[in-house]
């Protein structure tokens, strides 16, 4: 009787070690441990089907880009010229970078002046600080024109 009892735990231990080894392998992969937790509750393959349904509920994350606006400006300036996807990606990154710099500078200015709100004045000052010379002057005039048009409409 005792040898049989020893064989059963010995047989169970390797079986228990294999899922532990699989868990160790799957843990760095991200969402794999969550799927493994669902398997015993969902009883096998049905659990993996539920994982797919959960994926459908979340849907795709929308990525906001400036691509359509870049294209519209390009067509206003040069109607006959196109743009490659790589160039579009570079332009999108450029606009995101400038936006982050202006937002950061505007936030600093608001903090320095102990104001809780970023207004057009902070944006205008940050444009003058971030952009060089003539570019800053043109950006300020275009920005002022856009704000005036927005408030009058």
Curated annotation (Swiss-Prot):
Task performed by this protein: Core component of nucleosome. Nucleosomes wrap and compact DNA into chromatin, limiting DNA accessibility to the cellular machineries which require DNA as a template. Histones thereby play a central role in transcription regulation, DNA repair, DNA replication and chromosomal stability. DNA accessibility is regulated via a complex set of post-translational modifications of histones, also called histone code, and nucleosome remodeling.
UniProt crosslink position (Glycyl lysine isopeptide (Lys-Gly) (interchain with G-Cter in ubiquitin)): 149
Reported modifications of this chain: Can be acetylated to form H2BK6ac and H2BK33ac.
Modified-residue entries (N6-acetyllysine), positions: 7, 37
Database matches in InterPro entries: Histone-fold, Histone_H2A/H2B/H3, Histone_H2B, HISTONE_H2B_site
Compartment(s) of residence: Nucleus; Chromosome
Protein name as it appears in the record: Histone H2B.7
One Gene Ontology CC term in the entry: nucleosome
Region called Disordered, residue ranges: 1-60
Gene: H2B.7
CDD domains, alphabetized: HFD_H2B
Annotated GO MF terms: DNA binding; protein heterodimerization activity; structural constituent of chromatin
Subunit structure: The nucleosome is a histone octamer containing two molecules each of H2A, H2B, H3 and H4 assembled in one H3-H4 heterotetramer and two H2A-H2B heterodimers. The octamer wraps approximately 147 bp of DNA.
